[in-house]
Amino acid sequence: MADTTGRIPLWLIGTVTGIPVIGSMGIFFYGSYSGLGSSL
């Protein structure tokens, strides 16, 4: 992680790509669970 000159750090790529994916998956699972709970 020391040699990041001229390159994008991997942790930055992982954070930028991971947060929207985890957020969308969380919203999807929360919606499905709340939908199941209201239907039951």
UniProtKB/Swiss-Prot annotation:
User: What are the subcellular locations of this protein?
Assistant: Plastid, Chloroplast thylakoid membrane
User: Which InterPro entries would you find in this protein's record?
Assistant: PSII_PsbJ, PSII_PsbJ_sf
GO biological-process terms attached to the record: photosynthesis
State the UniProt keywords alphabetically. Answer: Chloroplast, Membrane, Photosynthesis, Photosystem II, Plastid, Reaction center, Thylakoid, Transmembrane, Transmembrane helix
Q: Where are the annotated coiled coils located? A: none
Which parts of the chain span the membrane according to its record? 8-28
Which Gene Ontology CC terms are recorded?
A: chloroplast thylakoid membrane; photosystem II; photosystem II reaction center
Answer whether the UniProt record assigns the keyword Thylakoid to this protein: yes
What topology does the record note for this protein and the membrane?
Answer: Single-pass membrane protein
HAMAP family, per the entry: PSII_PsbJ
Family membership, please give it: Belongs to the PsbJ family.
Q: Which NCBIfam families match?
A: PRK02565.1
According to its UniProt entry, the function of this protein is described as: One of the components of the core complex of photosystem II (PSII). PSII is a light-driven water:plastoquinone oxidoreductase that uses light energy to abstract electrons from H(2)O, generating O(2) and a proton gradient subsequently used for ATP formation. It consists of a core antenna complex that captures photons, and an electron transfer chain that converts photonic excitation into a charge separation.
Subunit arrangement? PSII is composed of 1 copy each of membrane proteins PsbA, PsbB, PsbC, PsbD, PsbE, PsbF, PsbH, PsbI, PsbJ, PsbK, PsbL, PsbM, PsbT, PsbX, PsbY, PsbZ, Psb30/Ycf12, at least 3 peripheral proteins of the oxygen-evolving complex and a large number of cofactors. It forms dimeric complexes.
- How is this protein named in the record? Photosystem II reaction center protein J
Q: Which organism is it from?
A: Amborella trichopoda
Q: Which gene encodes it?
A: psbJ
